[in-house]
UniProtKB/Swiss-Prot annotation:
MF GO annotations: rRNA binding; structural constituent of ribosome; tRNA binding
Quaternary structure note: Part of the 50S ribosomal subunit.
Keyword Ribonucleoprotein: yes
Classification via InterPro entries: Ribosomal_uL16, Ribosomal_uL16_bact-type, Ribosomal_uL16_CS, Ribosomal_uL16_dom, Ribosomal_uL16_sf
Disulfide bridge map: none
Keywords: Ribonucleoprotein, Ribosomal protein, RNA-binding, rRNA-binding, tRNA-binding
Gene3D superfamilies named in the record: Ribosomal protein L10e/L16 (3.90.1170.10)
Location of the region described as Disordered in the Swiss-Prot/TrEMBL record: 1-22
Pfam families: Ribosomal_L16
Protein name as catalogued: Large ribosomal subunit protein uL16
Length: 142
């Protein structure tokens, strides 16, 4: 699973998820992509499950790019622990995703129907609504 090799600080504050993605909202590598329509934390496990679903469906045809990285540590306290005595230990890592962010891309020798179905399977593993985009659809919107 994805996680940073080392960070400057072990723990982070939760922060806010307002506004839209200003970076990473266009296709950069492949011809097809999966774009977020809502904001959410996406865990490293969810990213890995989506990647596996896409890889399995495309049968290693083409290339898959993961455009998000879980760089935010989420801390948890043990169950039935009294209040106080500091912040809990980091349990898992999440990627903060805002609307408009491209999550995954597929390129290479892949038909649009295959890419669409692979992205649909990947989107079922994610906690947000998503949209399938292509280079053509991106050009029409601009």
């Amino acid at each position: 699973m994805l996680s940073p090799r080392r960070t400057k600080f072990r723990k982070q504050q939760r922060g806010r998820m307002t506004g839209k993605a200003t970076r990473g909202n266009t296709l950069a590598f492949g011809n097809f992509g999966l774009q977020a329509l809502e904001c959410s934390w996406i865990t490293a496990r969810q990213i890995e499950a989506s990647r596996r679903a896409m890889t399995r469906y495309t049968r290693r045809g083409g290339k898959i790019w993961i455009r998000i990285f879980p760089d935010k540590p989420i801390t948890m306290r043990p169950a039935e622990t009294r209040m106080g005595s500091g912040k809990g230990n980091p349990e898992f890592w999440v990627a903060v995703v805002k609307p408009g962010r491209v999550l995954f891309e597929i390129g290479g020798e892949v038909a649009e129907e295959t890419a669409r179905e692979a992205m649909r399977l990947a989107s079922h593993k994610l906690p947000i609504k998503t949209k399938f985009i292509t280079r053509d659809s991106e050009a029409q919107e601009a």
